[in-house]
């Protein structure tokens, strides 16, 4: 459950970054979290989208035993998203863990089938299978790079595209 709350804190941080540039933001969660977030519903999210508000989905599914990766894939499917943008601690998808293998090779592009077959640790297996079944592509990029969110939004990113 700490992981669920950590995603709420991360969304608050990123939301404030966006707000400081004048953008409207909202954070939706599957559970009540004080006055900082609102309870997720597809209708509420769509109202925010129609209003030009950037919506952050935090808290995973709200249930233990499901990763926050699974939660975000679920929300993307529910919202008929075009793709999922994942800001991670590493800057893309690698053939092995770059933290333990300095020779790890980064993919510029890889299919979700390959991710599943090679058991690459981009997102957990449940979330990967959901992406495959619902044809949901991913864009994986490093959050630690300067301007990474803006660069990714503008199509200039140093990450990996996961195709379906």
Regions from the PLM with identified roles:
Residues 1-164:
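C-terminal catalytic "cap/lid" subdomain
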């Amino acid at each position: 459950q700490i992981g669920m709350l950590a995603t709420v804190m991360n969304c608050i941080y990123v939301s404030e970054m966006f707000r400081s540039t004048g953008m409207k933001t909202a954070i939706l969660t599957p559970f009540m979290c004080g006055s900082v977030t609102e309870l997720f519903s597809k209708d509420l999210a769509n109202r925010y989208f129609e209003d030009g508000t950037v919506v952050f989905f935090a808290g995973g599914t709200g249930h233990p035993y499901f990763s926050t990766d699974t939660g975000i894939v679920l929300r993307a499917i529910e919202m008929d998203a075009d793709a999922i943008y994942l800001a991670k601690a590493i800057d893309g998808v690698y053939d092995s863990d770059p933290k333990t293998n300095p020779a790890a090779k980064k993919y510029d592009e890889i299919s979700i089938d390959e991710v599943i077959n090679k058991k690459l640790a981009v997102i957990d297996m449940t979330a990967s299978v959901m992406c495959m079944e619902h044809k949901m592509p991913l864009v994986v990029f490093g959050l630690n790079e300067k301007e990474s969110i803006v660069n990714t939004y503008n199509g200039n990113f140093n990450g990996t595209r996961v195709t379906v």
